[in-house]
């Protein structure tokens, strides 16, 4: 069973998604171990501030190195995770091959950025690997972290009810899936049976 630790400014946002549906059931059944950690808990100031102005000026704020370093150091004392993944638009674009590689690990730490990004010094110190979910800009790293976690969770034994479910999906076998229909025939559009016949 893999353990995934997510370092974020919004742990409740992550928990809300990860407690539902297939991933939530997989967690409850003990097939995957996921923990969300609030970086603000390591701010070290009364206002729990974790951002600062960028060195050299410019617009926007940057996440400070120290709270991130302290948070991930604390996580490593519990999980001993060798790999830290930073969700970043500058990183390798996520593919199913990368998901399969990460899903084989015993534990992972996923770091969510925010504001204009993260102080590069802490990424270098942690030897963080950068992964992107696409060539576009989001307000934070939480959604990319959830995408990665969801994709990894699906490959863990017991998470999906059917052990063959992931192996026949288009991203897994490299082939596009055919259109999908339900068995209900009472719909104003042509029935699946009629559509199937029209394709023959």
Can you name each region flagged by the protein language model?
Residues 187-198:
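Single conserved hydrophobic/aromatic residue that forms the stacking wall/gate
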Residues 64-114:
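S-adenosyl-L-methionine/SAH cofactor-binding core of RNA-modifying enzymes
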Residues 118, 122-165, 169-171:
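Structured adenosyl-cofactor binding patch, chiefly the S-adenosyl-L-methionine
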Residues 50-70:
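Short, structured active-site "lid" loops
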Residues 38-49, 128:
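Short, hydrophobic/aliphatic alpha-helical segments
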Residues 5-7, 35-37, 85, 108-109, ...:
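Hydrophobic/aromatic beta-strand patches that form the interior of the parallel beta-sheet core
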Residues 164-189:
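C-terminal functional extensions of proteins
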Residues 2-41:
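Glycine-rich, flexible N-terminal cofactor/catalytic loop recognition
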């Amino acid at each position: 069973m893999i353990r995934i630790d997510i370092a974020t400014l919004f742990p409740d946002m992550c928990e809300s998604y990860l407690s539902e549906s297939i991933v939530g059931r997989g967690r409850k059944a003990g097939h995957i171990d996921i923990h969300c950690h609030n970086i603000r808990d390591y701010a070290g100031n009364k206002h729990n501030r974790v951002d600062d102005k960028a060195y050299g000026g410019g617009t926007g704020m940057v996440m400070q190195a120290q709270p991130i370093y302290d948070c991930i150091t604390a996580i490593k004392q519990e999980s001993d995770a060798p790999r830290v993944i930073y969700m970043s638009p500058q990183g390798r674009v996520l593919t199913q091959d990368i998901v399969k590689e990460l899903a084989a690990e015993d534990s992972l730490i996923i770091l969510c950025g925010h504001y204009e990004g993260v102080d590069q010094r802490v990424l270098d110190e942690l030897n963080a690997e950068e992964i992107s979910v696409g060539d576009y800009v989001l307000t934070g790293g939480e959604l990319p972290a959830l995408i990665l976690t969801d994709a990894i969770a699906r490959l863990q034994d017991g998470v999906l009810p059917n052990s063959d479910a992931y192996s026949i999906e288009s991203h897994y076998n490299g082939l596009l899936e055919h259109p999908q229909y339900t068995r209900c025939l009472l719909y104003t559009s042509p029935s699946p049976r009629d559509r199937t016949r029209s394709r023959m």
